[in-house]
């Protein structure tokens, strides 16, 4: 274990100052944001701009009862992102993503762990639905482990 002794900032050390608004009404507010992933280049020969996230920066977790396909479809209507639970089979995921619903591609992630079975499931799903699966959630208890870093490099 490595001990870090340098000074860390906390929430009490941060001051958030609102900027002046140019909006005349709250009805003009848009929650949508565009996020560019710095180290990402799409594997296909499509427009790079299409592979940045554009939606509401709220994410429904991949917990049981939350990260369901039904919930994902409902939240995708409002451009809210969902990470599906890991318990879906490859067949269920293929059937879900291999549809004519671009909201699923743009607002839903398949979840995997770091087991070999999860990696095989990802390869099977991706091989069939290809570019319709745009996001993958890697669910692991400790994101600082060497095991996680090695799995990301895969």
Task: Give the ranges of each region predicted by the language model.
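Active-site entrance/lid segments in N-terminal catalytic domains of soluble metabolic enzymes
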Residues: 1-154
